[in-house]
């Protein structure tokens, strides 16, 4: 009987998986059972429709720390722009409406906020109350905690990291500035997106060792027993501040720094410094290791509206209203003034953990197609969630699609 049940589940799920780009809002108990039975806990990122589920329900697969909502949530006014109905996106195969274009990319949800008002909002394969993984978009939440501590004079961005984390004294981290870590220029031997070296598949890779120690990836013989001892033992492979190299380890150290300075857990820091003050309407959460260690480089999950609300903190009016406490105009200028990379990762910058800052727009992306765009002066925020393909494609919207959206925002005045 048990074998027959397994056969039925297998056939049913094979049909379900056959359309990996299908958008699905709800799941039967049978589908959920098979998902949990099929996914090794640490390979939730396998891609396709399995990841469509895990990206939406990370708390079913990992321990989490709760990030508490505000008692006075921000109420988004709604004023849909008619101009969005006429947006046409050109592609290699023809033209598509905005809705059809987003569906083709299997976007889970998409929101556009202008001057604090929702002008476009669609949910394709998640619900408004769902808490979707941010992946690396989480990095700019971590860097915002750091900028708030800098603005409170609790951290000197030019000071060496071991001054704040004594455990790093005598290690290769010694004499590396907080600023170099913020800007992905620490020089430490870890590159998280040099995919040919296997950062997520090769147990000998430094990133794999970090993430397996946190429970993100499957444990191997090379998995460290202590993530902190592992970080202390890392070596440099370049001189700090010479070359940017995208590294999850840098962001993890920033999270460690924030916890060390304040004596508080990461989830509580996000709650107290960002989520409650900004008027979050829903609790969020951050995934934890089995030892209760947060993933500050990509472990958060939140509703789409709360991600957009976070983005609003970087608009000109919000920075002024908060007296530059979370982020200052000088820090925004540093992000835009940072030189773009000159290697294969151009035009990325990774200044203060942000990927891009050009033509007035800041952007941060995350694995699988999460993204946050902010035009501070025009008071525009665009945010969306997606899930990873079986080939780990990112499915970020194209520059031309972004341009058409920005163009539509100047209409209907």
Which residue stretches match the model-derived regions?
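N-terminal leader/targeting segments and the immediately adjacent pre-domain N-terminus
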Residues: 22-126, 183, 187, 408-413
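Active-site-proximal alpha-helical segments within enzyme catalytic domains
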Residues: 184, 250-257, 296-320, 370-387
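Active-site Gly/Thr loop motif
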Residues: 281-284, 332-385
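Catalytic-site signature segments of enzymes, centered on catalytic residues
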Residues: 128-129, 195, 208-288, 298
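Active-site helix/loop module of the DD-peptidase/beta-lactamase fold
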Residues: 151-194, 233, 262-298, 302
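Active-site SXXK
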Residues: 116, 133-157, 181, 254-258, ...
């Amino acid at each position: 009987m048990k074998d027959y049940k397994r056969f039925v589940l297998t056939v049913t799920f094979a049909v379900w998986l056959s359309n990996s780009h299908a958008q699905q809002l709800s799941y039967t108990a049978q589908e959920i059972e098979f998902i949990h039975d099929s996914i090794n806990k640490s390979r939730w990122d396998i891609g396709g429709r399995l990841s469509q589920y895990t990206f939406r329900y990370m708390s079913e697969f990992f321990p989490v720390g709760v990030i508490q909502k505000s008692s006075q949530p921000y109420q988004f006014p709604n004023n849909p722009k008619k101009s969005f109905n006429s947006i046409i996106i050109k592609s290699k195969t023809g033209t598509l409406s905005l809705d059809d274009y987003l569906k083709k990319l299997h976007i889970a949800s998409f929101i556009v906020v202008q001057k604090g008002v929702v002008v476009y909002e669609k949910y394709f394969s998640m619900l408004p109350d769902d808490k979707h993984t941010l992946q690396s978009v989480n990095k700019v939440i971590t860097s915002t905690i750091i900028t708030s501590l800098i603005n409170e004079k609790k951290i000197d961005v030019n000071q060496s990291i071991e001054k704040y984390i004594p455990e790093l004294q005598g290690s290769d981290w010694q004499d590396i500035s907080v600023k170099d870590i913020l800007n992905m220029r620490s020089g430490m031997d870890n590159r998280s997106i040099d995919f040919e070296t296997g950062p997520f598949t090769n147990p000998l890779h430094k990133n794999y060792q970090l993430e397996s120690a946190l429970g993100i990836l499957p444990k191997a013989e090379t998995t460290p027993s202590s993530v902190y001892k592992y970080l202390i033992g890392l070596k440099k492979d370049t001189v700090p501040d010479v070359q940017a190299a995208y590294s999850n380890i840098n962001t993890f150290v920033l999270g460690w720094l924030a916890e060390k300075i304040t004596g508080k857990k990461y989830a509580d820091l996000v709650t107290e410094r960002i989520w409650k003050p900004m008027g979050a309407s829903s609790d969020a959460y951050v995934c934890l290791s089995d030892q209760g260690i947060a993933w500050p480089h990509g472990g958060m999950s939140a509703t789409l509206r709360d991600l957009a609300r976070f983005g609003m903190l970087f608009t000109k009016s919000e920075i002024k209203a908060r007296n530059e406490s979370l982020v200052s105009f000088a820090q925004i200028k540093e992000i835009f003034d940072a030189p773009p990379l000159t290697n294969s990762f151009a035009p990325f910058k990774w200044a203060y953990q942000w990927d891009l800052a050009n033509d007035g727009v800041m952007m941060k992306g995350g694995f699988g197609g999460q993204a946050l765009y902010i035009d501070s002066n025009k008071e525009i925020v665009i945010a969306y969630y997606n899930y990873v393909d079986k080939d780990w494609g990112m499915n970020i919207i194209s520059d031309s699609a972004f341009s058409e959206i920005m163009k539509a925002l100047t209409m209907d005045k």
